[in-house]
Amino acid sequence: MNIPIGAGHGLSNIEGHADFDIVWPWNRPEGQRRGATAVLRVRNEVDSMRFVLPPLLRACDEVLLVDNLSDDGTGEEATRVAAELGLGHKFVLREYPFAVARAGAEHLATNERSVHSLAYFYNWCFAQTSTRYTWKWDGDMVLTTEGEASMADLSWQVGMVDAVIRFPRHGLYIASESKAYLDLGLRNVEEWGFPMSPDFVYTKAPEWEIRTTPDEFRVFPLPQGLCVELKWLDGDEFAHWSNPESFATSLRNRRKRREWEVWNALQAGEVPERVVEIDAPPGVHVVDHVTRTWLPQAPRPFEVDDPDHAKKHLRA
């Protein structure tokens, strides 16, 4: 009989790094408190921190940022942003000093109980929280004004029930401070909000980590237009993947193939179908323009034209 991952006291890693063994939050003497924590796992996201953190800090009870071997000052910049907002008391910085396997072939070849495993890394990160609810958040995801209000409302409403929140996001490809390209040709609604309990922990899946769920739980999808995912065209967007072949064929990787298509087209000076070119007004950064003005003012219901999604009846 298989024992559920979250059933025991915690997890130990095969390398014997006792300082990075995992104790599940629900087993700690102090227990868990009501509220919600946004958990960010980041590496070299310094340019995104000033956009990502402010709405999260306002919307959540706590923001936990786990820095995984950044060498660009991401942790320092995140600390500065939180302090500048007067919300440093909501911000927690942790360091994870081990190289983590990239999604795809590297992940598949890594033992699930290794400190280098994506699943172990995610479990360690979320084990640092103290609230009953968590948001799995990326270091390049920026809430719109509507998204911030929605997350703030949900963070106190869902803390006592087994509810999973599916949060939509749209790729925003940044060409400069004044120009970006918004991909409205991909419907991407993933599960980002989870209770912190033994039923909701991470395990190994073929290309990446996946969160376990009980047989019965409630799922609440949010509407489109609440969040963008920053993709800097002068950066290395696919560094966390082993190679392009790792997402070349699987239906699960349809989103990554779309991003690869859009990224390479824009690099070649072409704007793909269903990608919208957006110019910010003078003196306003294009990320602020899109999240505070363009998306909130777009007609509702906000729709994404993704024929493949409708044709294949995909979940996300």
PLM regions with names:
Residues 33-36, 40-54, 69:
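Active-site beta-to-alpha loop of glycosyltransferases that engages the nucleotide-sugar donor
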Residues 61-72, 92-96:
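Short beta-strand/loop segment that forms part of the nucleotide-sugar
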Residues 1-29, 108-126, 141-316:
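Catalytic-site signature of metal-activated, phosphate-bearing donor transferases
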Residues 65, 133-136, 164-168:
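A structural signal for short, well-ordered beta-strand segments and their strand-loop junctions
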Residues 19-27, 44-64, 76:
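Short, well-formed alpha-helical segments that are part of the catalytic scaffolds
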Residues 131-144:
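Short beta-strand-to-loop acidic/aromatic patch adjacent to the donor-nucleotide binding site
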Residues 13-36, 75-133:
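Active-site-proximal specificity loops/subdomain of glycosyltransferases
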Residues 60-61, 130, 159:
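Residue-level detector of structured alpha->beta connecting loops
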